Amino acid sequence: MNNAPVIHCEKLSKTYVEGKLRVPVLHEVEFSVAPGERIAIVGASGAGKSTFLQLLGGLDKPSNGKIWVNGNDINQLSEREKGLLRNQHLGFVYQFHHLLPEFNALENVCIPLLVRGGIKPKHARQKASAYLEKVGLSHRQKHRVGELSGGEKQRVALARALVTEPCCVLADEPTGNLDQKTAEQVADLTLQLNRSLNISFVIVTHNREFADKMDRVLLLDKGQLQSESERNH
């Protein structure tokens, strides 16, 4: 069994520069994600949590340091290669679902598979349907985005993130726009899928109950990640 980290970074730093103004956000962060591990990133608003996720996903460039995703040094990749790496190895879930309103749930989940290529549309639909079933929405596959509730939209977004079978899902406040009951349901579903699919999750959240169910809770403060809690499962 391969126990190599699915994401690993060394001395990761990020400073935003505007003219003479320098805003340090991250300073020499060391971080690794094991296969199947679930990690919560917590911290005050503006601490740099979303920036950290963007760096891990190759959506922003670090000022210093290195990041490996499934063994690939993303600093050495072109933008096109980063896009291919994201499609193959990473899934993304955001506070806002970012579903395309002109398509139904099934079509939205199909999109990452069709972008990747090498799969017939029929088989992409079959796989997308299977993942909608995993998130409890097999009965809503043909419904357009506007016909879905907030919780259902986020479930579709979760299925879309998982359908390519990534090594890790990066989630930024995935329950932030939901009421408490729906947030609990989406959080529990996320944990269930983490266990059943053995896909790692790195989740930025202000939801303390959700964070406390993770394997590790890391606090981002003053540019550094500090361990708050760790569990042995």
Swiss-Prot record:
Keywords assigned by UniProt, alphabetized: ATP-binding, Cell inner membrane, Cell membrane, Membrane, Nucleotide-binding, Translocase, Transport
GO terms for biological process, alphabetical: lipoprotein localization to outer membrane; protein localization to outer membrane; transmembrane transport
Domain ABC transporter: 7-233
Superkingdom of source: Bacteria
Pfam families reported in the protein's UniProt record: ABC_tran
Stored Gene3D superfamilies: P-loop containing nucleotide triphosphate hydrolases
Subcellular location: Cell inner membrane
Entry annotated with the keyword Translocase: yes
Predominant place of localization: membrane
EC number: 7.6.2.-
Known function: Part of the ABC transporter complex LolCDE involved in the translocation of mature outer membrane-directed lipoproteins, from the inner membrane to the periplasmic chaperone, LolA. Responsible for the formation of the LolA-lipoprotein complex in an ATP-dependent manner.
UniProt-recorded name of the protein: Lipoprotein-releasing system ATP-binding protein LolD
Organism: Coxiella burnetii (strain RSA 493 / Nine Mile phase I)
